[in-house]
Amino acid sequence: MTKADLLFKDNITKIMSEGVFSEQARPRYKNGEMANSKYITGAFAEYDLSKGEFPITTLRPIPIKSAIKEIFWIYQDQTNDLVVLNDKYGVTYWNDWEVGHTGTIGQRYGAVVKKHNIISKLLKQLEDNPWNRRNVISLWDYEAFEETEGLLPCAFQTMFDVRRVNGELYLDATLTQRSNDMLVAHHINAMQYVALQMMIAKHFGWRVGKFFYFINNLHIYDNQFEQAQELLKRQPSECNPKLVLNVPDGTDFFDIKPDDFALVDYDPIKPQLRFDLAI
């Protein structure tokens, strides 16, 4: 059993046995009913990527390709334009969060990255002084929230640190998330930001180090309890999945493409489970 599978089962068990029910929930199911959830607070996980620990479960298939494309949309294209996400990457699941008929998700995610020139500033800081302690990506922009409607960012802050170990530089990352749908999005979000960590490390020719993941509200929606029990019953696959970025060290961050990533040794348990998402 991989570390990700162990933590997945532990979190499901903890939510189902110790979690409390939400009240006055904002999300709705497609039938219009309120999407309440059972949740715990303050969930934390640590993975040492340099030792082959990756935050992806084998208990069900995780659609990692589309998740990584979303990261490119946010941090390379730096846009909130759904046409770009749909046409360039073939990813459509954000369409449910379109604001009005604007063709965008509002001033969120990529729009905030572009507004503050976040990636270029981050890369410059790391180039000038890899050991500085100010390498922060923050998508929590109150001014942007007042400017337009739109879903507030769930994965809203990422921090980076560099360590020298036996003469080699390792890039660590910490992802902070205000809210996470445990069964559907947990490993998608984690692997997205591992991909971002790998892109930044490759830009400098560094190795990837540790990935820390903190979630304030970790939940299972009340229409997913049956799927939660099914996942607890499943025995994990014997594979040991790893995400690989097949570009030379020193490849510019903006020259990396989604197809440069490969998920190897991944043989998840099937069949896939169906989820009615909360919007």
Curated annotation (Swiss-Prot):
Pfam families attached to this UniProt entry: Thymidylat_synt
GO MF terms held by the record: thymidylate synthase activity
EC number: 2.1.1.45
One GO cellular component term noted in the UniProt record for this chain: cytosol
Record-level GO BP terms: dTMP biosynthetic process; dTTP biosynthetic process; methylation
Catalytic function, reaction form: dUMP + (6R)-5,10-methylene-5,6,7,8-tetrahydrofolate = 7,8-dihydrofolate + dTMP
Family that this chain belongs to: Belongs to the thymidylate synthase family. Bacterial-type ThyA subfamily.
Function summary: Catalyzes the reductive methylation of 2'-deoxyuridine-5'-monophosphate (dUMP) to 2'-deoxythymidine-5'-monophosphate (dTMP) while utilizing 5,10-methylenetetrahydrofolate (mTHF) as the methyl donor and reductant in the reaction, yielding dihydrofolate (DHF) as a by-product. This enzymatic reaction provides an intracellular de novo source of dTMP, an essential precursor for DNA biosynthesis.
Subunit structure: Homodimer.
Protein name: Thymidylate synthase
Organism whose genome encodes this protein: Streptococcus agalactiae serotype Ia (strain ATCC 27591 / A909 / CDC SS700)
